[in-house]
Amino acid sequence: MEELPATAIGIKTKDGVVLAAERRLSYGDFVLSKSARKVFKLGRFGIAGAGIVGDIQTLTRIMNVEIKYYEMYNSRKISARAAAKLLSVILYQNKVLPYISELLFGGVDEDGPKLFILDPIGSLIEDSYAAVGSGARVAIGVLEAEYNESLTSEAAKELAIKSMKSAVERDVMSGDGIDILIINKNNIYEDFIKI
């Protein structure tokens, strides 16, 4: 499969999850926008992705509704694993005409921080760090060299920025700033880094 345009990064920390994605929206060698968001809050969770931005936005809207429905119907909060599995099922149900996106899903629940990687047809993998999209090959090298399980959220944010800057230097389909989501047990913080 061809690499999907954009770069998104996820890092699990000792107390949370950091998701980051750059803002360039490109198709082929044409830059359509320099301000396309690819990182979104989903209640207590977050999602970041590479691929068709409209598909990522649509999946975010669907998941917002599905999470609220689950919690209302079951009278309890959905776990990060159950929410990620729900997203996996939605992707798999559309495998004939898939959402063209590689996704990172993260959050903190009673079992601690969780980070999941999903492909366009719903494969679900839990990991400690990940990079998806056209800049992933460069970004993952930085993550592999510098990741450790004792990272704080602030240190993981700095690692995500460093990793993304490396990817942006080498990948023409990525660039124009970094959106960051820091998810802890009690809060979700958003940040934007201009590059």
Swiss-Prot record:
Top class in the EC scheme: hydrolase
Catalyzed reaction equations: Cleavage of peptide bonds with very broad specificity
Major site of localization recorded for this protein: cytoplasm
Mechanisms controlling activity: The formation of the proteasomal ATPase PAN-20S proteasome complex, via the docking of the C-termini of PAN into the intersubunit pockets in the alpha-rings, triggers opening of the gate for substrate entry. Interconversion between the open-gate and close-gate conformations leads to a dynamic regulation of the 20S proteasome proteolysis activity.
Enzyme Commission identifier(s): 3.4.25.1
Subcellular location: Cytoplasm
Active-site residues, as the UniProt record annotates them: 7
Keyword line: Autocatalytic cleavage, Cytoplasm, Hydrolase, Protease, Proteasome, Threonine protease, Zymogen
Pfam hit, one: Proteasome
Positions of the propeptide removed during maturation: 1-6
Molecular-function GO term, any one: threonine-type endopeptidase activity
Gene Ontology CC: cytoplasm; proteasome core complex, beta-subunit complex
Gene Ontology biological process: proteasomal protein catabolic process
Tree of life domain: Archaea
InterPro entries in alphabetical order: Ntn_hydrolases_N, Pept_T1A_Psome_bsu_arc, Pept_T1A_subB, Proteasome_sua/b, Proteasome_suB-type
Known function: Component of the proteasome core, a large protease complex with broad specificity involved in protein degradation.
Family as reported in the entry's similarity comment: Belongs to the peptidase T1B family.
Subunit composition and interactions: The 20S proteasome core is composed of 14 alpha and 14 beta subunits that assemble into four stacked heptameric rings, resulting in a barrel-shaped structure. The two inner rings, each composed of seven catalytic beta subunits, are sandwiched by two outer rings, each composed of seven alpha subunits. The catalytic chamber with the active sites is on the inside of the barrel. Has a gated structure, the ends of the cylinder being occluded by the N-termini of the alpha-subunits. Is capped at one or both ends by the proteasome regulatory ATPase, PAN.
Name of the protein described by the UniProt record: Proteasome subunit beta 1
Organism of derivation: Sulfolobus acidocaldarius (strain ATCC 33909 / DSM 639 / JCM 8929 / NBRC 15157 / NCIMB 11770)
